[in-house]
Swiss-Prot record:
Residues with N6-(pyridoxal phosphate)lysine modification: 191
Cofactor names: pyridoxal 5'-phosphate
GO biological process: one example: pyridoxine biosynthetic process
Keyword Cytoplasm annotated: yes
Classification of source organism: Bacteria, Pseudomonadati, Campylobacterota, Epsilonproteobacteria, Campylobacterales
Name under which the protein is recorded: Phosphoserine aminotransferase
Catalysed conversion reaction: O-phospho-L-serine + 2-oxoglutarate = 3-phosphooxypyruvate + L-glutamate; 4-(phosphooxy)-L-threonine + 2-oxoglutarate = (R)-3-hydroxy-2-oxo-4-phosphooxybutanoate + L-glutamate
Length: 358
């Protein structure tokens, strides 16, 4: 029996995708070999590779103003690649909303970029998304769309004249996005759109001009990968194959509007369970900034019960509920592949647990 996986990433995958990958693992579409065994220069793999890029653009409704890059190194490598490629001689402005923005800020500072932290929610342990106004003439404005540890999420992105950079690793492909002022939109795909080992970057083509005439190693230059269609070196072929299956699955769900509708239903159910617990459970995030992806909460009446909650949940078939080591508590990551019935099972367990230990 499969466990219900609430892990923050790598995370649960749709069963039908796992079954299709299993079916094709040794014999891809009757060709007599695995997709993992063939060259990335073959027609067979190119169909997967370019098909995945086109489907990703279709889901977000993007035209040819954007390039889709498949890169390695995780989203963490982008913390350095972004300032390397996109910083000019001005100020690069960051909003600090958690661990991942702190890491991005640190990498930019290591590179000697003129970093300005325009606002931070660190004083309140990152429990909300601070309101912000960026400078019109900043080299770029940087935000993290969703914060996995603290359970906060931008409901709408800030409107900026400066190019907006968005780390969307933990809410990738979970909802439609207004790209009107987004210059670069990126994430690792292992939470909502595949397996670990692949990052997907949507970059507006005019931003690639910033990489020209810069002394950047070839592998770290966006232009290198754009000019070579993300085939400059051997890409993570199996991760791209899995990403392609995920794109098909998302399209078959009815696209990102339908996916967002389901995600909203799941989150509403879980937050209602927390809010109606008479203070037994308490969410970390400010209600107006609650994440649809990561629900971080505590057993407010007795935090010593939290390890027991995780243990008993696992015995009941639910894994991945232990909170991040920085924040502690309990965290349920309810990404695209989790369905409403699975979240309902968690809510029923929470009510039973409260009944036993309140």
């Amino acid at each position: 029996m499969r466990k219900i996986n609430f892990s923050a990433g790598p995370s649960t995958l749709p069963l039908e995708i796992l079954e299709q990958a299993q079916k094709e693992f040794c014999d891809y579409q009757g060709k007599g070999y695995s997709i993992m065994e063939i060259s990335h220069r073959t027609k067979v793999f190119e169909e997967v590779h370019f098909g995945a890029q086109e489907k990703a653009k279709k889901l977000y409704g993007l035209n040819d103003d954007y390039e889709v890059l498949f890169l390695q190194g995780g989203a963490s490598l982008q913390f350095a690649m972004i300032p390397m490629n996109l910083a000019l001689n001005g100020v690069c402005e960051y909003v600090n909303t958690g661990v991942w923005t702190k890491k991005a800020i640190k990498e930019a500072q290591i590179l000697g970029v003129n970093v300005k932290i325009v606002v931070s929610s660190e004083e309140s342990n990152f429990d909300h998304i601070p309101r912000v106004e960026f400078s019109d003439n900043a080299d770029y404005a940087y935000i993290c769309s969703n914060n996995t540890i603290y359970g906060t999420q931008y409901q709408n992105y800030p409107k900026t004249k400066a190019p907006l950079i968005v780390d969307a690793s933990s809410d990738f492909f979970s909802r439609k996005v207004d790209f009107s002022n987004i210059a670069l939109f990126y994430g690792g795909v292992q939470k909502n759109a595949g397996i670990s080992g692949l990052s997907c970057i949507f970059i507006r083509k005019d931003m690639l001009e910033r990489s020209k005439n810069k002394q950047i190693p070839s592998m770290l230059n966006y232009l290198t990968h754009a000019e070579n269609q993300s085939l400059f070196n051997t890409p993570p072929t199996f991760a791209i194959y899995m990403f392609n299956l995920e794109m098909d699955w998302l399209l078959n769900q009815g696209g990102l509007d339908k996916v967002h509708e389901k995600n909203s239903q799941k989150a509403t159910m879980l937050y209602k369970c927390i809010d109606l617990s008479d203070g037994f459970y308490k969410g970390h995030a400010d209600k107006k900034d609650r994440s649809l992806m990561n629900v971080s909460f505590n057993i407010a009446k007795n935090k010593d019960l939290e390890p027991l909650f995780v243990k008993e949940a696992e015995e009941a078939g639910m894994i991945g509920l232990k909170g991040h080591r920085i924040l502690g508590g309990i965290r349920a990551s309810i990404y695209n592949a989790l369905n409403l019935d699975q979240v309902k099972i968690l809510c029923e367990f929470m009510k039973e647990f409260q009944g036993k230990y309140a």
